Amino acid sequence: QTTVIKPLVKQPTAFAIITDNQTYANTKDAMHQYKTAVEDDGLATYLISGDWQNPDQVKQIIIKTYQECPSLEGLVLIGDVPVALVRNAQHMTTAFKMNEKAFPWDQSSVPTDRFYDDLNLKFEFIRQDSVNHQHFYYKLTEDSPQRLNPTFYSARIKYPEKKEGDKYAAIASYLKKAAAAKADKHNQLDRVFSFNGASYNSDCLIVWMDDEKAYMENFPLAFGRQMGFKHWNFRMKHPMKYKLFSELQRKDLDLFMFHEHGMPTGQLINDELACTDFNNRYKPQIRN
């Protein structure tokens, strides 16, 4: 069963919150607080929940909503919304390359929400994962466009299962926090911090060259004050985590973004210390 709660107000553009019935039932108050906050931010907001059996069901409701409201510009997937793992598409990943024939499917396939937000791409369903029933394998077809051109922007709010704990309480807490932040009109988003961790995007600095343009477009107020925007790289210090801890404790900081590899309970900040000078290359060994 799918439930669609339509926007309460008319706006030039629209947004969709998509969740599963179980998550909605356990976070209902927080979900509606978040919906109201997004609408107050100027976006007509749909709240869609369903008992999703596969990604195609979710995609069909997205397409239907888009047909009814062509001004739909973005969406967020909250909770246990099925995940599409795509094969035959590694030529469109930034750095991930793994032999699909030599490695297990769950390792060599690419989990991506481009399945939902890029309606130009064509996929062929293969099968459901035998262990994680929320994972579904698809193939990017040969006659599909071979470049990304998303129809919407999208995000996913999902609690990592391996972290254990009450996932619904955590999601509800996050949504209430996000709603409160949107409601605070006096606290402008003018202090932003971005950090790039080790081994991300193949450690290629060229990849990040145009990042500042995107930051200036999305967070213009941060560039109107001294030190309003900081962009750090893991190469700046080893270890970096203690300096990051100091920044995270700043009361005035509005947004902190990590670009790095991670695990459910850990983040990969620094790489092994590079041998860039004499002291790094020659370390006397102390023997007992």
Roles of regions detected by a PLM:
Residues 1-288:
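Cysteine-dependent hydrolase recognition
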